[in-house]
Regions:
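Short beta-strand->loop
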Residues: 107-114, 126-130, 153-156, 234-236, ...
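Extracytoplasmic ligand-binding site segments that recognize negatively charged/polar headgroups
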Residues: 32, 36-48, 69-73, 85-220
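Periplasmic-binding protein-like
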Residues: 117-120, 134, 194-198, 204-205, ...
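An extracytoplasmic/periplasmic, membrane-proximal ligand-sensing/linker region
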Residues: 190, 294-339
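A bilobed periplasmic-binding-protein/Venus flytrap-type ligand-binding module shared by bacterial periplasmic
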Residues: 137-144, 183, 254-266, 285-288
Length: 339
C-alpha cells in the first residue's frame, strides 16, 4: 500500500513538472501578434474586431490591436519604446508619412508577393503594404449649408463665424494631409491660404475622431475628413444629410499602409497577417468600417452607396521625397498663422 502511495505521489509530481514544462510550448504555439494603430481602426465599430475574428480563425494566434490617437502617435510610441516595444506591426501610416517611418529604421521588408492593387499609383514599396485609400475633403451638413464652398478661396471668403475643425499634422495623418493638399494646390502661396483659413479654425484636435465628434455635435460647420465619410451615414445610418464638399481644383490622395517592425519576434506571423489583409476576405471589412476604398475587390463587392460619393478628380499627390524633405517646414508655416 505504501509503495502504491509513493508511486502515486511520484506520478503526480511528474505530471506537475511535465505540465509546467509544457506551458511555454503552449504559449509559443499560440503567440500574440501586436498591432499598433489609430483609435478608429481598433474601435468596436472599426475594422479591427472583424479582422481579429477572421485572422484568428486561421492563424492559431491572438491578434491584439493597441490604439493611439492616430498612427503618427503609434509610430512615436514605438520609437520611444525602441527594441523593447511589444509592437510587431504599425498599421495606419500613409503615403505622406512613409518617409518618416523609414527614417526611424524601425521597419523591415515585408518579403511578400503582393497582388496587383486597384489604387491611384503603381505600388513598388518593399517595406510597406497598402490596405486602403481615400481622398481628403471637408464634410458638411446639408441641413445647415445649402451651397458648400467649392475651393479654399470660397471657404476663406465666408463670414468669420463659419467654423471648421481640423487635426494636428504632427499627430494626425488627415491633419498632415491638409498641409499637403494646400501645398499641392498653391505651392509658395500656401501661407496666404493658411492666413485666410486661420480665422475659421475653431480648434485643432489631436486626432480625427475628436474632430468628427465636434462636427457631429454642431460645434463646427465643416470638418476635415474624407470624400467617403458620408458613406458611413448613408449606408450605416440611412442618412443622406452629410456630404463632402467638392473642390474643383482637386482632392489630396491618401493611401494607408502597414509595416513590420524589425524588432518583432513574430515576423513570419506578421507577414501572414499583412498577406491576409490584402486578400478579398481581409479587405471585406474595410469599406464599411474604416469607410475608405479597398485596395482590391473585397469579398461581396463594394456597397453601391460608395458610387454616390463625390468624384475627387483631379486627384493630387506630391512626390514622397519632397514631402519627407519639407514636412517640418510646411507644418511650421501653417502653424505660424494659427497661433
Amino acid at each position: 500500500m505504501r509503495k502504491l502511495m509513493i508511486a502515486s505521489v511520484r506520478t503526480s509530481l511528474c505530471a506537475v513538472v511535465l505540465g509546467a514544462l509544457a506551458l511555454p510550448a503552449i504559449a509559443q504555439d499560440n503567440p500574440t501578434l501586436t498591432v499598433y494603430t489609430y483609435d478608429a481602426f481598433a474601435a468596436d465599430w472599426g475594422p479591427g474586431p472583424l479582422l481579429k475574428e477572421g485572422f484568428e480563425a486561421q492563424c492559431a494566434c491572438t491578434l491584439d490591436f493597441v490604439s493611439a490617437d492616430d498612427s503618427i502617435s503609434a509610430l512615436r510610441r514605438a520609437q520611444l519604446e525602441g527594441d523593447a516595444t511589444e509592437a510587431d506591426i504599425i498599421l495606419g501610416l500613409d503615403t505622406a508619412t512613409i518617409g518618416e517611418g523609414m527614417a526611424t529604421a524601425l521597419f523591415t521588408e515585408h518579403q511578400l508577393d503582393l497582388p496587383d492593387f486597384d489604387i491611384p499609383l503603381e505600388w513598388t514599396d518593399e517595406v510597406f503594404v497598402p490596405f486602403d485609400y481615400g481622398y481628403f475633403a471637408f464634410v458638411y451638413d446639408t441641413q445647415s449649408i445649402a451651397t458648400p464652398p467649392a475651393s479654399f478661396e470660397e471657404l476663406i471668403a465666408l463670414p468669420q463665424d463659419f467654423k471648421i475643425v481640423i487635426q494636428d499634422p504632427r499627430s494626425s495623418t488627415p491633419g498632415l494631409g491638409l498641409i499637403l493638399w494646400i501645398k499641392a494646390l498653391y505651392g509658395d502661396e500656401a501661407i496666404e491660404i493658411w492666413e485666410g483659413l486661420a480665422p475659421h479654425v475653431l480648434t485643432v484636435t489631436t486626432g480625427w475622431s475628436e474632430s468628427y465628434d465636434l462636427f457631429l455635435s454642431g460645434e463646427a460647420d465643416m470638418v476635415l475628413s474624407y470624400t467617403t465619410s458620408p458613406a458611413y451615414h448613408l449606408i450605416a445610418e440611412g442618412e443622406d444629410r452629410y456630404r463632402a464638399a467638392k473642390f474643383d481644383a482637386g482632392h489630396y490622395t491618401q493611401i494607408e499602409v502597414a509595416g513590420i517592425l524589425a524588432s518583432s519576434p513574430n515576423q513570419e506571423l506578421a507577414r501572414a497577417f499583412l498577406a491576409y489583409l490584402v486578400t478579398p476576405e481581409g479587405q471585406a471589412p474595410l469599406p464599411e468600417t474604416n469607410w475608405m476604398y479597398p485596395v482590391l475587390e473585397p469579398t461581396g463587392g463594394l456597397n453601391p452607396g460608395f458610387a454616390e460619393m463625390i468624384d475627387p478628380q483631379p486627384a493630387l499627390l506630391l512626390d514622397a521625397d519632397e514631402v519627407t524633405a519639407n514636412t517640418r517646414a510646411w507644418i511650421e508655416e501653417a502653424f505660424s498663422t494659427l497661433r
